[in-house]
């Protein structure tokens, strides 16, 4: 007898082949049978008539490194059909750590990934020093989602080199040898890869760039050679230029990545986004990735399935946050509804619009966001509820201002304070230069590009892209109206088999016999994203943006139902996923 059988559904099996009517049977946490009709009884049966059945989604770009130590649901990813997450990206993580340097790693993560430091300080248990000890601590965790991690270069460099590493001083041959040894040790203990950041905008709360940002080639190759030594692992990075800065070096990055991958015979995956300064640079990099394959390299650009940018509202960073009248009203009105009502008063509006910003706090890395947003209002869009991530030009704040005969700053003010004040506007920084998704469609369609950059668990106060797996289905396979859609089978494969295969997780990602029973049953016709909300549910009352979905009828991990109609069941089959051992 099977443990569970899913009948009556349309199987989109993750291989990219055409969807078909079929059944899936599960036994002992594995897929035991798949076919048009599977004979045999089951202890439990799910009627999936009118639903699609997919593999669980594998999200390879998250930052749950701290959250996984206290949260057993791993929201928001768990609510979007994700059954496996990979963390430790962008060169930041929490192991190895020198005793007494825990808070330094926290302020590094807070600065780079906008995760409240107070939440990390209260939530992380710090049961480790070395990376293998970190994995052993994680192995004790039982969650609703499987999780794997990479070794972060930033933490490793600071551990080996101390203050010299933290301050980005050059590594000596002995430093490199030790980092190589510890990287090999981490891979052999189960790390899925090693990650680094070379992005100038990735900075700790103390203003210092991530350790390794300026690492010389011999240091980077030392990390890569450790992967070759261990015979496993992925080299992941946020390359120079990925944030729109340092674009000269962005073109050089591909050369060393190509050389490294061919030399170590391991995949290299890196963030790739379209930027406004050189809007065709991404295509040059993608073409280089194709050419690299002919030279024995494995380069896989990680791409975002929608515009990559900020969510702006009264509860996040916005242009008025440092204006005296706004600050006073925010102190007097503790609820967002009361604050919005006060801001709707014409006298208060006039006062705020007439004021200058107070000086930014030099000790707060994010306090200057108000100024940045104010000069980028031409990129700000009203996206509505439910959110439309491909808004037409007339929905930009600039266009609304022109139509109403006011300045953009006033149009932005009116949009922020409307209703109950919880509105979120979108400010795309990348992937929306032309005001549509055609570039993104080209990226997703490319065989070497990997779906990623959701940043689940990170950018808590500004970005909310952990819902991308759902968006891939609703927008690209069903709802897009301003251009061509993508086949459902392709969209599912992009975030199941393709992502799992990149990180060597070949036991999952498809609905095939013997594979891990990670499955979604989805009401595809009614699948939708809800509006983005700000909640204070992290340790110490830390805030984060959440976006829930409707339409996931069942999410199954290792054969156990973890979500039913979007609600957590309490099942905790999720475990640490170790790589080569």
Which role fits each region the language model picked out?
Residues 9, 29, 50, 61, ...:
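Divalent metal-coordination and catalytic microenvironments
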Residues 36, 90-92, 199, 240, ...:
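Short, ordered loop/turn segments at secondary-structure junctions
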Residues 70-193, 229-230:
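Divalent-metal coordination cores built from histidine and acidic residues
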Residues 134-138, 144, 150-160, 167-173, ...:
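Active-site neighborhoods of metal-dependent hydrolases
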Residues 364-365, 438, 442-449, 454-455, ...:
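C-terminal cap of metal-dependent C-N hydrolases
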């Amino acid at each position: 007898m099977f443990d569970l059988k899913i009948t009556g559904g349309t199987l989109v099996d993750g291989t990219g082949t055409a969807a078909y009517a079929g059944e899936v049977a599960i036994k002992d946490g594995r897929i035991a049978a798949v076919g048009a009709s599977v004979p045999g009884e089951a202890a439990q049966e799910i009627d999936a008539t009118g639903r699609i059945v997919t593999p669980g989604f594998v999200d390879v770009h998250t930052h749950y490194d701290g959250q996984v130590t206290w949260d057993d649901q791993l929201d928001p990813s768990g609510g979007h059909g994700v059954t496996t997450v990979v963390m430790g990206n962008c060169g930041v993580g929490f192991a190895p750590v020198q005793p007494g340097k825990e808070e330094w790693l926290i302020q590094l993560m807070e600065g780079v990934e906008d995760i409240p430091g107070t939440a990390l300080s209260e939530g992380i248990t710090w049961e480790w020093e070395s990376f293998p000890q970190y994995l052993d601590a994680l192995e004790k965790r039982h969650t609703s989602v499987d999780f794997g991690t990479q070794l972060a270069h930033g933490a490793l460099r600071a551990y080996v080199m101390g203050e010299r590493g933290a301050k980005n001083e050059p590594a000596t041959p002995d430093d490199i040898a030790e980092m190589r040894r510890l990287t090999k040790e981490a891979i052999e203990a189960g790390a899925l890869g090693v990650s680094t950041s070379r992005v100038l905008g990735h900075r700790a709360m103390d203003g210092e760039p991530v350790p390794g940002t300026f690492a010389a080639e011999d240091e980077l190759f030392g990390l890569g050679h450790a992967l070759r030594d261990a015979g496993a692992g992925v080299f992941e990075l946020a390359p120079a230029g990925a944030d729109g800065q340092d674009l000269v070096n962005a073109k050089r990055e591909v050369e060393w990545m190509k050389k490294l991958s061919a030399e170590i015979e391991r995949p290299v995956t890196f963030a790739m986004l379209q930027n406004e300064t050189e809007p065709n640079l991404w295509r040059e990099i993608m073409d280089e990735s194709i050419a690299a394959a002919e030279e024995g390299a494995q380069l896989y650009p990680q791409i975002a399935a929608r515009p990559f940018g900020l969510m702006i509202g009264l509860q996040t960073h916005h242009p008025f946050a440092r204006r005296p009248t706004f600050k006073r009203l925010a102190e007097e009105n503790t609820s967002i509804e009361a604050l919005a009502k006060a801001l709707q008063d014409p006298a208060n509006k006039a006062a705020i619009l007439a004021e200058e910003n107070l000086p930014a706090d030099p000790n707060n890395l994010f306090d200057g966001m108000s100024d940045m947003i104010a000069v980028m209002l031409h990129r700000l869009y009203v996206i509505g509820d439910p959110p439309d991530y491909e808004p037409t030009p007339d929905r930009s704040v600039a266009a609304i201002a022109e139509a109403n005969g006011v300045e953009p700053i006033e149009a932005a003010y009116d949009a922020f304070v409307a209703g109950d004040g919880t509105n979120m506007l979108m400010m795309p920084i990348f992937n929306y230069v032309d005001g549509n998704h055609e570039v993104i469609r080209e990226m997703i369609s490319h065989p070497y590009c990997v779906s990623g950059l959701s940043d689940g668990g990170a950018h808590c106060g500004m970005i909310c892209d952990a819902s991308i797996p759902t968006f891939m289905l609703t927008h690209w396979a069903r709802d897009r109206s301003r251009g061509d859609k993508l086949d459902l089978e392709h969209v599912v494969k992009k975030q199941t088999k393709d992502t799992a295969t990149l990180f060597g997780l070949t036991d999952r990602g498809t609905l095939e016999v013997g594979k891990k029973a990670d499955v979604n049953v989805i009401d595809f016709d009614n699948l939708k994203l809800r509006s983005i909300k700000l909640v204070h549910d992290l340790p110490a009352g830390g805030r984060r943006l959440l976006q829930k979905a409707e339409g996931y009828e069942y999410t199954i991990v290792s054969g156990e139902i973890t979500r039913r109609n979007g609600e957590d069941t309490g099942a905790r089959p999720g475990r640490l996923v170790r790589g080569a051992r």
